[in-house]
Amino acid sequence: MSKETNQDMGTGSVKKLMVQMAVPAVVGQVINLLYNVVDRIYIGHIPEIGGAALTGVGLFTPILMLITAFAMLAGAGGAPRAAIAMGKGDRDTAEKIVANCFTVLLLLSVVLTGVFYGTLPTLVRLFGGSDVTLPYAVQYGRIYVLGSVFVLVVMGMNPFITTQGFAGTSMLTTVIGAVINIVLDPIFIFVFDMGVAGAAIATVLSQAVSAVWILRFLTGRKTILRLKARNMLLQGKIILPCLALGISSFVMVSTESILSVSFTSSLSRYGGDVAVGAMTVLTSVNQLITMPLQGICQGGQPLISYNYGAKKLERVKEAFFCQFFVCVGYTTVFWLLVLFLPRVFAGIFTSDAALVDYTAWAIRIFLAGTFSVGFQVSCQLAFMALGQAKISLIMACLRKLILLIPLIFILPNFFADKAFAVFLAEPVSDILAAAVTTVTFFTFFRKLLKAGEQ
């Protein structure tokens, strides 16, 4: 791509641009999903220790989510701000945003590595780790934490490539890392006989290569916004609005940690190991829904943000509705597939007959509200694209903090089958959050567009 791509966002066909930018983003999200899925498959097949090792690595998931959340704080907050600045023709400010966010990511890597490396055993115990699973969680987690700088750079800086219109380059970042991880996993785990440690090393190495790829692009000739050392000194007026906007994504991702612990602790109490195992599968299936949605909205975000900054309001409307209907259509189709083919989805992740039976039952409950997720995600992320940090944050908090997590603990008091009640919390919160978010967005949409004209 070239600088003409940036100009096309203000004049080219909205639908064509959505396809050009959303498809690579969706592919990137799906490939990114393979990181977790492939790791779980390989680790779960380590002779003799596969089950315990897989459980141990799963216990590290809340910390992994927190690291991701901090990356999103800078990346998801800074990229829309940079796009808005580009739309206004203020390239200097946009480049300062890129550099300031990079500085924040480097500082976060130092802090997070220090905190999590030392406290990892204690945290895993709090998450439910046992004497059997704790060693695997700590072994995997400490290696991953030592390489967190690469994870933060990849997840935090890649959005700045997408927001410039280089969706294909952004996708390659993920493809390169995923392919390297898929190749290195069996080599380090089985050939070098390093087990769980090998899986962690493979992941860190793949992220390191992706990080180098990103930095070479952002400091090269093809990029529109160049990462420059002179812009890396933090400026409050530059970085604070980015972090304010990124809080919404930070909350969305970080609350997954709390959510994970809430589900597993409750299901362990009411349903035992098979319920916790089913939850692991359900989480993976749920990612098949949410991650492509994130990709679709990543494709729509630059179009919405750029044209909002350029005050081309009809194009903002067209871009949003294109994003909205694709998201709703995708979740509706997935919802129907889950209802009619629950055992197929369960069987993808496990061959254990008892676990397949239980998961097939649970998946119809847990994902009963999937059709509504497209409404909630597309509207909530559109608020972000329009620079509405406060409203986006409220909508992000609504589903998980205000509805889902409390319902996990409240609903079992009203049902004889308490495990059923825990699973039921998911669709109830999905539908309620979608209704509130959609009504709120369409109520404010016209006001937001009018404000952009002033």
What are these regions (language model features)?
Residues 43-65, 132-136, 196-197, 238-245, ...:
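Interfacial/gating helices of multi-pass transporter permease domains
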Residues 1-24, 82-149, 191-247, 304-369, ...:
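Short alpha-helical transmembrane segments in multi-pass integral membrane proteins
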Residues 30, 34-54, 124-131, 187-194, ...:
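Helix-terminus/linker motif at the lipid-water interface of multi-pass membrane proteins
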Residues 9-49, 62-77, 81, 106-113, ...:
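N-terminal transmembrane alpha-helices
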